[in-house]
Curated annotation (Swiss-Prot):
Residues 14-137 form the Rhodanese domain. It is an enzyme of class 2 (transferase). This is tRNA 2-selenouridine synthase. NCBIfam families: PRK11784.1-1, PRK11784.1-3, tRNA_sel_U_synt. One of its GO terms (molecular function) is tRNA 2-selenouridine synthase activity. The active site is at C97 (s-selanylcysteine intermediate). Its EC number is 2.9.1.3. The keyword Transferase applies. GO terms for biological process: tRNA wobble uridine modification. Keywords: Selenium, Transferase. CDD domains: RHOD_YbbB. Monomer. The gene is selU.
């Protein structure tokens, strides 16, 4: 049973979040995978390396024979059982290897012998990857409106609430600043790009999309970088700037970086370890900008952070964090953002408070 797919078929797979049983080795999967893929490899990393060496030294027939020798008996049966269970759990899914070659065909034939007929991606991960790249290039050509504003302006929430918005920071699992990490590890660059492409395809498919609403991001979001085709279009885009009162920004930052992050860490690790992780998270964020703050100012703010953490631990109040957060915003983040915005002042087409910008975007 062999499936042939056109470019539109590949896009449909991504739009539908079709479950993909990816039979490549874990090392390949970690380097790049599709969003709805699960990794159930035909060969583990060591087995794949051994077969690859054999192929180079003795040719394809010897490599194939070695592969069958390595994945035999109980190991083979365990893997068939895992694939069979995944197929039954995901009846609308599809098999995938690197290029739609021997590995996915072997798994498909073994499943057929076990009573399961399951399609495969002709062209494999490589074809899906090329589809993702091409889709991003094409979709990035649509007009873009960027949401700008100082830290704590609620830009991400505003983007999330737009039907034509794509939350780049959410996809990157990072909020873009020194304090931007989340509890989820960031994806590999290729996996991030694949996820972004799938999200853009789904957003475009849900509506007659005329323009994108994105947050005004730099090239890097944590360890991930935006695809060059999208980044180039963003440098030409119109910008709507959120200008909320300082006190409202502080409330948002308190909720996002202190209350929510403390909750998330304790939920993930338990009270004691979660508290330690939360403290390390805040100190790591401050330490990341030590050079720009200067050693003396950094030491002062770090001491105020320690005091605030002690107060939070003993009383539950996060108010003490204002002692270091306010000067950090006024002396570092706000001047830095204003400097960046000045360089693209001609792109700014609207300014207003959060609700005003949201209404303006909605009317586009």
């Amino acid at each position: 049973m062999q499936e042939r797919h056109t470019e539109q078929d590949y896009r449909a797979l991504l739009i539908a979040d079709t479950p993909i049983i990816d039979v490549r080795a874990p090392i390949e999967f970690e380097q790049g995978a599709m969003p709805a893929a699960i990794n159930l490899p035909l060969m583990n990393n060591d087995e794949r390396a051994a077969v690859g060496t054999c192929y180079k030294q003795q040719g394809s027939d010897a490599a194939l024979a070695l592969g069958h020798k390595l994945v035999a008996g109980e190991i083979r049966q365990q893997r068939i059982d895992a694939w069979r269970a995944a197929c039954l759990q995901n009846p609308q899914g599809i098999l995938c290897c690197a290029r739609g070659g021997q590995r996915s065909h072997i798994v498909q034939s073994w499943l057929h012998a076990a009573g399961i007929d399951y399609p495969l991606v002709e062209g494999g991960y490589k074809a899906l990857r090329q589809t993702a790249i091409q889709a991003t290039i094409e979709l990035a050509q649509k007009p873009i409106v960027l949401i700008g504003g100082c830290t704590g302006s609620g830009k991400t929430l505003l983007v999330q609430q737009q039907p034509n918005g794509v939350d780049l920071e959410g996809l990157a699992r990072h909020r873009g600043s020194a304090f931007g990490r989340t509890l989820q590890p960031q994806l590999s660059q290729a996996s991030f790009e694949n996820l972004l492409a799938a999200e853009m395809l789904k957003t475009d498919a849900r509506q007659d999309l005329r323009l994108w609403v994105l947050e005004d991001e730099s090239r890097m979001i944590g360890s991930n970088h935006l695809p060059e085709c999208l980044r180039e279009r963003m440098t030409q885009a119109a910008i709507a700037v959120v200008e909320d009162p300082f006190e409202i920004r502080l409330e948002r930052l308190n909720e996002e970086y202190f209350l929510r992050m403390h909750h998330d860490f304790t939920h993930a690790y338990g009270d004691e370890q979660g508290w330690q992780e939360y403290c390390e998270y805040l100190h790591h964020g401050l330490s990341a900008i030590k050079r720009r703050l200067g050693l003396q100012r950094y030491n002062e703010l770090a001491a105020q952070l320690d005091t605030a953490l002690t107060t939070q631990l003993t009383t539950g109040s996060t108010d003490g964090h204002l002692a270091w957060l306010v000067p950090l915003l006024k002396e570092y983040y706000d001047p830095m953002y204003r400097y960046q915005l000045e360089k693209k002042a001609e792109k700014v087409v609207f300014r207003g408070e959060w609700a005003e910008v949201a209404e303006w975007v909605k009317a586009r």
